[in-house]
């Protein structure tokens, strides 16, 4: 089997592999119990295809990682909540007349623990994306998230946040409603909470929109997620007045998990099964659940004041710089 030509568009390569993988699976089912030789060959083909998939998603450029993070089949916050929690109830509204569908909030249980969960939610299709503002939260969304987090702090419940947004909602209505103030208030309040906050970047982590719910004691990031001060397209338009330079901007912004771990912006990279979460969502959930449980166990030993101080010190030490 030939090596992959990574000069081709990522979507084209993945589509070709997926079609071949489906044909191999169909072939193995078709000949099952009828022709062992052909059946064995089909299994060999499937293994080779799996290796090619690993190869495809290994060593991606920053912009290719961005494409994977935006994949239409990539699991969303709701997908993870549904399978991570043994039971949960969604909570609505910011108590100021708004209930932003771009942010999901709720309370549930992982094993014997009660937890509060929240995260940005993208749609699966155009209609859903319009409803959820493509995962871009309004000021009401951040206030809803804050209301639920304050509930968690009051009742001493751990907070789990999931980040997947290109950024906060930009527009006249959002600015009139106090977008900057809503995000700033979240940042301030999250530093004051005396419960563990575990944040996971599952897709796009864009700008202040991501940071507004990402002040965590522990910040994890999926292998093919991105975390950035601005989208590469926006950055290239601002710096070079040319949106076609988005790939160059992505490299300069250091959006990849590997770069961010080196720069000490995040605490851990969560590997995606066989290189990609959207083809193996249930396996991805199991991996994430174990990681979250480990961190909940770790922070169980901290007192409320220690949790608050730990978060403060973490962000005081954030980042890495070099003297020129």
From Swiss-Prot:
GO-annotated biological processes: fatty acid biosynthetic process; malonyl-CoA biosynthetic process
Domain CoA carboxyltransferase C-terminal, first and last residues per copy: 44-298
GO molecular function, one term: ATP binding
PROSITE patterns assigned: COA_CT_CTER
Pathways per UniProt: Lipid metabolism; malonyl-CoA biosynthesis; malonyl-CoA from acetyl-CoA: step 1/1
Catalytic reaction annotation: N(6)-carboxybiotinyl-L-lysyl-[protein] + acetyl-CoA = N(6)-biotinyl-L-lysyl-[protein] + malonyl-CoA
Chief location of this protein within or outside the cell: plastid
CC per GO annotation: acetyl-CoA carboxylase complex; chloroplast
Keywords of the record: ATP-binding, Chloroplast, Fatty acid biosynthesis, Fatty acid metabolism, Lipid biosynthesis, Lipid metabolism, Nucleotide-binding, Plastid, Transferase
HAMAP family in the record: AcetylCoA_CT_alpha
Assembly and oligomerization: Acetyl-CoA carboxylase is a heterohexamer composed of biotin carboxyl carrier protein (accB), biotin carboxylase (accC) and two subunits each of ACCase subunit alpha (accA) and ACCase subunit beta (accD).
Family under the similarity heading: Belongs to the AccA family.
Task of the protein: Component of the acetyl coenzyme A carboxylase (ACC) complex. First, biotin carboxylase catalyzes the carboxylation of biotin on its carrier protein (BCCP) and then the CO(2) group is transferred by the carboxyltransferase to acetyl-CoA to form malonyl-CoA.
Annotated protein name in UniProt: Acetyl-coenzyme A carboxylase carboxyl transferase subunit alpha
Underlying gene: accA
